Amino acid sequence: MTAPAASVGSTPALSLALPVRLDATNAETVSRELMARLRDSAGGQLAEVDATALQSFDSSALATLLALQRLATEKGSRLELRAAPVRLVELARLYGMQDLLLPQTESKAV
């Protein structure tokens, strides 16, 4: 599902990829897999979440991202969301979570 990314400075980044669909039907499984990858990674590094493939989602996607953000913070790591669909950014704003989840988000046109 995911592969390590190129190094950022001297600390390698962890690359996590969101699936095409992330909603209530698969959020628990996706979250468990991504959290395990993040949990097993070294602390203090950049963890990039690539949302390029994400096309269909609901608020469960935000819950998954929030859980990843919390774990990254606990590990002293930084989480960055890449290529977020415009609709995901809008959903985060609707829930008042844009500053927490999307501070440096690079969104893609949808």
Region roles according to the model:
Residues 1-57, 67-110:
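STAS-like cytosolic regulatory interaction modules
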